[in-house]
């Protein structure tokens, strides 16, 4: 006898969206998750709430001309699909861009979404028109950040009589009868009162079995499992980093992807991952090895561990994967930003809802305080307390402080000074051969960047802009770009291309759709949207198939 119509494995954003779609169509759902109720929303709760919209009213009000055609050009140029198994990821890419240019915004707003009026410009590229990057700003921030986005869906099912949450239930096996998935088996973990994101006990106190007509895997990726990240590290990126910090909680362990694969599901593109190169150690950690990502403006001077400037166009915020590959091939696991107080005040944001309390709490008064002189309070807290930050009034003292940090290659002051001096000479007038200075000036053509995000070019060593600041940047794990292969209804496929009856996948476990809708790279603002779009498809697909 079935325990519910559908079992959803994972209480993150994709799972919540899928459950909402099922409940709206009259189906009963069990949501199984290995963590406690405090972790509903998963990684999405911790996020900045960035969403990729195309030709939105917010864009148009800021003078941004966007279109479905331009967005698809950017997506395909960024994804770089080049494998036979990219058939469904490519289909998902076309469908997702259509969604982002079509009903995505209105569909979310009908459910309560509000967005911040300024649009961010992430992954700017710096190559040609058919290459990687966003041609225009498309990063829309949820008013209320990740928690507000999660709540849009959580509140729709929290008290529903059709939904049962089975927390602290860890799935260990898919039940397969006559080639069809018919449920899940697993272990009941001991109760936990651990706060959200804190690693919880894995002590088993019992077992369970749930049966249903369909199972949706929405369990997330591998970003919290550093062993699995290293195992899947592709040779094309160079050596596997020795030093990694974690951008997601420990429960993001990738177990369900392997469990589904063992049952017969096809996993593709597991060598494609999205890890950030601007990670800093959290001075107030929540989970093990907790790192935070800097969302940088384009003005910081970026040096490798040996003091050499990163090549064109590896500027802050331009090409995450290209920068990651360059770092890994440099022989070291970290890099440096050199900047000053003027730059950090305007150009440093920190990813995550807890690092943006004004946006998260939707406090307009606190938000307006960002226009005051000085860095935002969360950023200043890292300057004051972060182990990766150095401040000094002279470049010589700054380099000495950088060399005092643990686990660094000693920098030669003359080499660093030569890079800084050469860069500073290029801002003396409105002409330059320096690509980064040209990029900064181009960014300031966008009203949102000019007033809130990008400082006017000036000398790093200008005493009026000081003190000087250096930041040691680590590689920060985050997203799994490959995963369970699915069709456009989120049905999981077998290796021979046929559907695996009764099994669906959504969110990061499915590579955000199809087993890798992003290809090799992301345009940003696409992960939450990918969870929403694929979760919606999974809920609708399962509902249609069991009707």
From Swiss-Prot:
It is an enzyme of class 1 (oxidoreductase). Its cofactor is FAD. Its EC number is 1.3.99.-. Disruption phenotype: Cells accumulate a small amount of 4-androstene-3,17-dione (AD) and 9alpha-hydroxy-4-androstene-3,17-dione (9OHAD) in the first 24-48 hours of cholesterol degradation process. Disulfide bonds: none annotated. FAD binds at residues 5-36. Keywords: FAD, Flavoprotein, Lipid degradation, Lipid metabolism, Oxidoreductase, Steroid metabolism. The keyword Kinase does not apply. GO terms for molecular function: steroid dehydrogenase activity, acting on the CH-CH group of donors. One of its GO terms (biological process) is lipid catabolic process. Pathway: Lipid metabolism; steroid biosynthesis. The low activity could be due to different substrate specificity. Belongs to the FAD-dependent oxidoreductase 2 family. This is KsdD-like steroid dehydrogenase MSMEG_5835. It comes from Mycolicibacterium smegmatis (strain ATCC 700084 / mc(2)155) (Mycobacterium smegmatis).
């Amino acid at each position: 006898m079935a325990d519910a119509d559908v079992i959803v494995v994972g209480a993150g954003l994709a799972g919540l969206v899928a459950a909402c779609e099922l409940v709206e169509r009259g189906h009963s759902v069990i949501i199984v998750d290995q963590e406690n109720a405090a972790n509903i929303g998963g990684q999405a709760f911790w996020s900045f709430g960035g969403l990729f919209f195309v030709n939105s009213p917010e864009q148009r009000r800021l003078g941004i001309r966007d279109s479905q055609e331009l967005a698809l050009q950017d997506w395909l140029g960024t994804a770089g699909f080049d494998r036979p198994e990219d058939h469904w990821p490519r289909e998902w890419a076309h469908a997702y861009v259509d969604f982002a240019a079509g009903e995505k915004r209105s569909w979310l707003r009908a459910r309560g979404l509000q967005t911040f009026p300024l649009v961010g410009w992430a992954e700017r590229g710096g190559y040609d028109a058919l290459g990687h990057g966003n041609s225009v700003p498309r990063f829309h921030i949820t008013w209320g950040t990740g928690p507000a986005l999660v709540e849009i869906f959580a509140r729709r099912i929290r008290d529903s009589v059709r939904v049962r949450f089975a927390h602290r239930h860890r799935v260990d096996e898919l039940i397969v009868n006559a080639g069809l998935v018919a449920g899940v088996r697993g272990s009941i973990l001991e109760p936990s009162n651990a706060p959200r994101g804190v690693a919880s006990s894995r002590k088993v106190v019992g077992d369970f079995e749930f049966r249903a007509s369909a199972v949706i895997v929405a369990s997330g990726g591998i970003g919290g499992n550093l062993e699995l990240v290293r195992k899947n590290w592709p040779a094309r990126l160079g050596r596997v980093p020795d030093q990694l910090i974690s951008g997601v909680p420990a429960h993001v362990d990738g177990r369900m992807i392997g469990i589904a694969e063992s049952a017969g599901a096809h996993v593709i593109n597991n060598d494609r991952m999205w890890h950030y190169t601007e990670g800093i150690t959290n001075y107030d950690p929540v989970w093990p090895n907790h790192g935070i990502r800097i969302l940088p403006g384009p003005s910081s001077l970026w040096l490798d561990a040996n003091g050499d400037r990163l090549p064109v166009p590896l500027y802050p915020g331009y090409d995450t994967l290209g920068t990651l590959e360059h770092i890994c091939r440099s022989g070291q696991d970290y890099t440096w930003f050199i900047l000053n107080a003027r730059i950090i005040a305007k150009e440093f944001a920190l990813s995550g809802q807890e690092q943006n309390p004004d946006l998260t709490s939707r406090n307009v008064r606190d938000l307006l305080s960002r226009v005051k002189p000085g860095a935002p309070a969360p950023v200043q807290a890292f300057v004051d307390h972060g182990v990766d930050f150095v401040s000094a009034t002279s470049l010589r003292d700054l380099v000495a402080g950088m060399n005092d940090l643990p686990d660094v290659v000693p920098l030669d002051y003359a080499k660093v000074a030569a890079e800084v001096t050469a860069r500073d000479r290029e801002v003396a007038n409105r002409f330059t051969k320096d690509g980064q200075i040209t990029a900064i000036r181009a960014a300031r053509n966008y009203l949102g960047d000019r007033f809130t995000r990008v400082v006017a070019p000036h000398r790093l060593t200008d005493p009026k802009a000081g003190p000087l600041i250096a930041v040691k940047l680590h590689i920060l794990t985050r997203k799994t770009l490959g995963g369970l292969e699915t069709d456009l209804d989120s049905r999981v496929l077998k290796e021979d291309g046929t559907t695996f009856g009764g099994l669906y996948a959504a969110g990061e476990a499915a590579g955000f759709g199809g087993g890798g809708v992003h290809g090799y790279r992301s345009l940003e603002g696409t992960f939450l949207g990918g969870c929403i779009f694929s979760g919606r498809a999974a809920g609708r697909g399962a509902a249609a198939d069991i009707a």
